[in-house]
C-alpha cells in the first residue's frame, strides 16, 4: 500500500502540472460551461433530426385514434396508437441520466398525448432516468476503489517477484528473463492505470481542459496494455520453440522477443492514436464507446489465440513423449507449460465476455464487478502463478531461509534441525532444476549454465556463505 500512496502523490503532481499548463484556458468562462455547451449541442442536433423525420415520414390514415409524432424537448416520438404507452431509452444529455433506463409517454384513448394534471401540458415521464443515480454513483466509486486496490496489490506482488528474480542469481536463465520482462510490463501498466484513474477519470477539471498530457497518458496506457499480452505470447513462443521446434535447444536469441514484446505493441497504439485524433477526438480519449478500440483489442485477441494454439501443441508433444519415454525432463516442462496454459484463458476471458454485457441494471452491475476483477488483478495473478507458486522459487527461498536459521539460530537443537533441512533441500535442488535441460543440454544465461550455478552451490567448501 506504500506504493499506492506514493503513486497518489505522483498523481497529484501530474494533475497540478496539467492544470497549470492550461491556466490561461481556465480564465475563460467557456470552459466552465463546457458540459452545458455539449448538452445543448446534443439536444439541438436531436431536435433537427426529429423535425426532419417528422417531415419525411408518410402520415398514417386516421381510421383509428392516433397520437401524432412529436418532439417533447428532449426526445422524438413516433405516431402512437391510442391507449398505448410508448417507450424509449433515456438520452445521454446529462451525467445523472442512465441511458439504460426507459422514458415513457402515454397516448390516451382519445388519441391525445397525456396531459400532466398540474401543468395541464403534454408530459413525458423521465423520472426513471435518474431514479437510481445515487446507486450508480456508489457502484462507480466501488469499482474505482476496486481497481485501485487491484493495481496496488498487483504492484506490490510484482515488485516482490522482481526482487526475488534479481536477487537470487541461481534463478538467472532465459525463461526467467522473459518472466522479468512480463512482470515489468505489468508494473508499468499498473502505474499508468493508477495515474489515469486518479488524475484523469476521477477529475472532471482535467477532462474538460483536455490537456495533451492526458492523451499521451492514454496512449502509453494502451501501449503497455498491449505489451502485457505480447509478452505472454513471447512466453508461449519460447516454450514452443524450446520443446517442439528446436527439440529442446540449448539457447535462443532473446532480441526477437524484445522486439515482439516491447516493439510490436507500438504499431497498433500509434495507429489508434492517429485514428482517434481524426475520427473520434473526445476529451482525453477517455470514452470506450468507439469501434476504434478494436485497433488495440484485435491484435491482443490474435496474440491470445496464437498463444493458446502453441500451448496446446506443446501439451500434445509432451504427452506423447511421456507416453513413449517417461522422461523426467518432459514432466518438468509440463509443469512450466501448465502455468502458462492456466494464465492464457484467465487473461483472455474478458474479451470473451466483452460483447455480452447484459441490459438489466443489476445484471449489468454484476458484469462490471466481474470485468474489473478480471482486468485490474491480472498483475497479482501473474506474479502468483509465475513466481509464488513456482517450485524453483520455493526451493531457493526454502534453502536460503534454512541458511538464515543456521547462521542466526539461537539453540543447538534449532541449528541441528535447520542443518538437516538444508541438507534435504540441497539434495532436492537437483530434482527441481533452475532451468530445464534435456539429454545433457543446459539453457545458458550470461555464459553460465543453470546446472553449473546449482553445482557451484552444492560443491562449495562453505555452503552457507
Swiss-Prot record:
Q: Which residues are glycosylated?
A: 22, 68, 120, 125
Biological process annotations from GO: adenylate cyclase-activating G protein-coupled receptor signaling pathway; angiogenesis; cell surface receptor signaling pathway
Name the organs or tissues of expression. Detected in gill, brain, heart, intestine and testis.
The signal peptide annotation in the UniProt record is 1-20
Q: Which Gene3D superfamilies match?
A: GPCR, family 2, extracellular hormone receptor domain (4.10.1240.10), Rhodopsin 7-helix transmembrane proteins (1.20.1070.10)
How would you describe this protein's topology in the membrane? Multi-pass membrane protein
Note the Pfam families from the entry. 7tm_2 (PF00002), HRM (PF02793)
Checking InterPro entries in the record gives: GPCR_2, GPCR_2-like_7TM, GPCR_2_calcitonin_rcpt_fam, GPCR_2_CGRP1_rcpt, GPCR_2_extracell_dom_sf, GPCR_2_extracellular_dom, GPCR_2_secretin-like, GPCR_2_secretin-like_CS
* Compartment(s) where it occurs, according to its Swiss-Prot or TrEMBL record: Cell membrane
* Domain of life of the organism encoding this protein: Eukaryota
Q: What is its main location?
A: membrane
What ranges does the Cytoplasmic topological domain annotation cover?
167-177, 241-254, 317-331, 390-465
Give the GO cellular component terms, alphabetically: plasma membrane
Q: Which cysteines are joined by disulfide bonds?
A: 50-76, 67-107, 90-129
Q: Which UniProt keywords apply?
A: Cell membrane, Disulfide bond, G-protein coupled receptor, Glycoprotein, Membrane, Receptor, Signal, Transducer, Transmembrane, Transmembrane helix
Q: Which GO terms describe its molecular function?
A: adrenomedullin receptor activity; calcitonin gene-related peptide receptor activity; calcitonin receptor activity
- Similarity field: Belongs to the G-protein coupled receptor 2 family.
PANTHER family attached to this UniProt entry: CALCITONIN GENE-RELATED PEPTIDE TYPE 1 RECEPTOR (PTHR45620:SF21), PDF RECEPTOR-LIKE PROTEIN-RELATED (PTHR45620)
Q: What does this protein do?
A: May function as G protein-coupled receptor for calcitonin-gene-related peptides and adrenomedullin. Specificity may be modulated by accessory proteins. May activate cAMP-dependent pathway.
Protein name listed in UniProt: Calcitonin gene-related peptide type 1 receptor
